[in-house]
Amino acid sequence: MVTSSPFKTIKSDEIFAAAQKLMPGGVSSPVRAFKSVGGQPIVFDRVKDAYAWDVDGNRYIDYVGTWGPAICGHAHPEVIEALKVAMEKGTSFGAPCALENVLAEMVIDAVPSIEMVRFVNSGTEACMAVLRLMRAYTGRDKIIKFEGCYHGHADMFLVKAGSGVATLGLPDSPGVPKSTTANTLTAPYNDLEAVKALFAENPGEIAGVILEPIVGNSGFIVPDAGFLEGLREITLEHDALLVFDEVMTGFRIAYGGVQEKFGVTPDLTTLGKIIGGGLPVGAYGGKREIMQLVAPAGPMYQAGTLSGNPLAMTAGIKTLELLRQPGTYEYLDQITKRLSDGLLAIAQETGHAACGGQVSGMFGFFFTEGPVHNYEDAKKSDLQKFSRFHRGMLEQGIYLAPSQFEAGFTSLAHTEEDIDATLAAARTVMSAL
């Protein structure tokens, strides 16, 4: 038991009840409302290292990590100190900032596909801009995305989008005109033949293919052997662009992202989460000849009041400096593999069908025999069982993403003792399911 006192959520319940009168659903982002796992959401008071404390005093080992950015652990002292210094100079300039150059150089040095980069304020914003750029560069309107891959909440991407849409049980979102998504083609993840068929059916009309190279928004799904390489070949054959949405995987799977880990280089990449060190940030980048189309260098317009603000740049720079230290990704892989393998072994020992895995500091599992290759496979998971498991783990002091359709994250702050405690809690909970 990780919590130091009997599990109670009185204050969380009170705050959430009040929030429901002030904000739609009581939250600022849908998955936080615990809709898919039942019960009331936990209201956090503070976070530090690998832990979170709620307003009732319960402590949790946190495997959400503010949905990925907290790869060095929450409130890392070096990041906090750097932010204190930066804040003394102002929170936003609305003008060029030397820190943008520093972070831009770090991103360009790290990510194989990026020769130039533009900073924005969120992953959604990065994906919106990169879609416009795909079309501007190719002169074509249609794109291919994959079922269950999430690229933010922009209208044109809310087609079989996984993540929060899947959590709420909605096929897509009201308010999105059919004309907006008419040029968004979809294929099952890991299905090269479906992609080839779409290109054959739409000759000379497809600007490119965008995907999460490792899916984290239908649960955790890895690419089959040859899938990413196949997409690269197909897009080159048709003079179309390949775009990796590495908002979640960038600087997490490896310092250079999935493209470094798997050796497949796209034309464009979107980033977010980790590159802001916990502050709002996004970025997109790629080949110089493509990026030169972005205003003011070129005609494709995109702008943002807070883009490249000094606080996000500062936190991002310090976070990437920490990640460059030797042994970082080896440690993440080691502890995450032990966690993932342990969860699957416990499920088997306690009689529950389960499958899953991990790559570096990202993991996930499903309550189904599997294997899970795509979104349709992911939907076979026993969602009611996951809900009971999630609640049980919460009461044991383990904070997991409140949706079967989200990946989990470890951090450099997680210890072997944290993994031990998590597996002990999982054994207790799965034995009682």
From Swiss-Prot:
The gene is hemL. PANTHER family: GLUTAMATE-1-SEMIALDEHYDE 2,1-AMINOMUTASE, GLUTAMATE-1-SEMIALDEHYDE 2,1-AMINOMUTASE 1, CHLOROPLASTIC-RELATED. Coiled coil: none annotated. GO terms for biological process: chlorophyll biosynthetic process; protoporphyrinogen IX biosynthetic process. This is Glutamate-1-semialdehyde 2,1-aminomutase. GO terms for cellular component: cytoplasm. Homodimer. One of its GO terms (molecular function) is transaminase activity. It comes from Synechococcus elongatus (strain ATCC 33912 / PCC 7942 / FACHB-805). Pathway: Porphyrin-containing compound metabolism; protoporphyrin-IX biosynthesis; 5-aminolevulinate from L-glutamyl-tRNA(Glu): step 2/2; Porphyrin-containing compound metabolism; chlorophyll biosynthesis. It comes from the Bacteria. Keywords: Chlorophyll biosynthesis, Cytoplasm, Isomerase, Porphyrin biosynthesis, Pyridoxal phosphate. The modification N6-(pyridoxal phosphate)lysine is found at residue 273.
